[in-house]
Every structure is written in structure tokens, then in C-alpha cells.
Amino acid sequence: MNKKKNQYNGWELKFFDKSKNFRNYQMSLIKKYLGDHIAEIGPGNGTNLSYYYDHPKKIDLYEPTKKLYLNLKKKFKDSKKVNFFNKKLSLKKKNYNSILYLDVLEHIKEDEKEIIKAYRSLKKNGSLIINVPAFSHLYSEFDKDVGHHKRY
């Protein structure tokens, strides 16, 4: 569990790693929108990356949680096309074909500002791909414990 308030540590990610059918389905819907240069925001332990790795030519991973960032660097250390950033998305003018927020936006308190920043970082006709937990009325202690600010 998350022992310290406001410090996300990703303890629940190992459970979501096992959702292979869901991840395969999700990737079948979004792969055609990825393009050659993508950014994934909050990739956690890299589960999603494993499903789309072969598609783009260049991948930038923005993981602000130090422990998860270090694990990502170790897991994909031999990759020539993955760049790692231990921070939130930096505004990069028209740099990406797509930006992924897969089960991440709910962790960002100022989500609207984040979406604007991401949009400004997309190339013309780029894709902003977002997956979030639905049904705000289901917001629970679990959401709080895993660092969710809200459901949508």
C-alpha cells in the first residue's frame, strides 16, 4: 500500500500487468494512431511499452517516480529507440506523432493544464490517446490509495 501521503510508488501495477487480454484489446484500438515518434506519460513499469514497442521508431518515456524510472531504464537498457526522462512531460513544440496517457491522467491534479501542454507538443494531425477510470461516482478509498485525484 501507499504508506506516505502524496507519494505514488506504483504498488498496484503488478496486478494490472496480468491483464493481457485487456492490453491486447487496447493496443489493437490505438496502434494505428501511434506514428513514428511517441511519448508515453507515466509508463510505470513499462507494461504498455511491451505491447507497442515494435511500432514506433522513437519512444520518449516520462516517468516522474524515481523508483519506476530506474526500473524502466534497467528493463529497456539495450533499446536504442527509447529515451528516458525522470520528470513530467516537458513542453516540446510539435514533437510527437502521439502522446499516451494510459491510466495516468487521473494521477495528475491539474489534468486540464497537462492536456493543453500535451496538445501543444503534438505534430500536426497528431493523436492524444487517453485511457482513464470512468464513473466519478465510483471514486473510492482504492482510488485515493493509488494516487488518483478523480475518476472521469
Describe the function of each predicted region.
Residues 1-102, 112-115:
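Conserved N-terminal segment of class I S-adenosyl-L-methionine
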Residues 47, 68, 108, 125, ...:
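Feature marks short, surface-exposed loop/turn motifs that line or immediately flank catalytic pockets
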Residues 103-107:
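A short His-aromatic
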Residues 129-152:
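Short, glycine-/aromatic-enriched active-site segment of Class I SAM-dependent methyltransferases
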Residues 59, 128-129:
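A short hydrophobic/small-residue beta-strand
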Residues 112-127:
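A short glycine-rich, Lys/Arg-flanked "PGG" loop and its adjoining helix->strand segment in the class I
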